[in-house]
A protein has these predicted regions:
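A generic "cationic amphipathic patch" detector
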Residues: 22-23, 33, 42, 81, ...
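Beta-strand-rich binding/interaction modules
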Residues: 94, 174-214
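Accessory beta-strand-rich segments of carbohydrate-active enzymes
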Residues: 4-17, 54, 58-161, 166, ...
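Short, solvent-exposed loop/linker segments at the N-terminal edge
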Residues: 167-175
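Accessory carbohydrate-binding/adhesion or oligomerization-edge regions at the termini
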Residues: 1-47, 123-127
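Surface-exposed, low-complexity/disordered Ser/Thr/Gly/Pro/Asn-rich loops and linkers
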Residues: 47-55
Length: 214
């Protein structure tokens, strides 16, 4: 799965009413590059509901918008947004439709855009609600404070969450491992394929090769 940074050319502004889905872009929108901490620029004050937990700064509700061009071939591929961290409750809209949401400010999450894209210009709008205080025991930051990536692949692919490897047994120079490779098929029919697995050491030397049909 191809992965590229998706941090450039975002617009940002504060949302006064997080429950009013207004699709215009206000004049005061700022052009930013992610990662972006929307809380750090707030003026600290003694009466903050968070107190010293977040540096006497209040959280607010934020909006991020980015447009990008989808070519015709992109409509027949998986296009997934990977958010490494967004604080706090996050709602992701693609061309005005809710494509995904996430309610934990510290964990990575994915939003599949395939069913919402169209040829030409597309709009991604991320609404981050961080106005419900207090919600942290330390400085959390606010908004899209970590990297965002665009993942793209064929409709038959290894899951965006990736493979897992676990050491089952380890003794001297012998090890037995268990590898899990989740495969997703978004095609309209079943597909037969070969899965090839290579295990390498820290220097890139191939230690094990396994290939089998599915």
């Amino acid at each position: 799965m191809k992965q590229e940074l998706f941090n450039d050319d975002w617009l940002f502004w504060y949302d006064e009413n997080s429950f009013a889905l207004v699709w215009n872009i206000p004049e005061q929108a700022q052009k930013i590059t992610l990662p972006h901490d929307a809380m750090i620029s707030e003026t600290p004050y003694a009466e903050s509901r968070n107190g010293n937990n977040t540096g006497f700064r209040d959280g607010k509700n934020y909006v991020y918008v980015k447009t990008f061009i989808a070519e015709e071939e992109d409509l027949y591929r998986e296009n997934i947004l990977k958010f490494e961290g967004s604080y706090m409750n996050t709602f992701v809209y693609v061309n005005g439709q809710l494509a995904g949401k996430h309610h934990n400010g510290y964990t990575t999450f994915y939003v599949n855009m395939k069913d919402f894209l169209h040829f030409g210009e597309n709009e991604i709008r991320v609404q981050v609600r961080n106005g419900a205080m207090s919600n942290s025991r330390w400085y959390s930051g606010g908004g899209l404070y970590r990297d965002v990536y665009l993942l793209s692949s064929d409709l038959l692919h290894v899951s965006a969450a990736g493979s897992k490897i676990r050491t089952v047994e380890l003794e001297n120079d012998f090890a037995r491992i268990e590898v899990s490779v989740p495969i997703e098929n978004r095609k309209c029919k079943g597909i037969q394929f070969d899965l090839k697995l290579m295990v390498c050491d820290k220097d890139g030397k191939i230690l094990l090769v396994d290939q089998r049909p599915y």
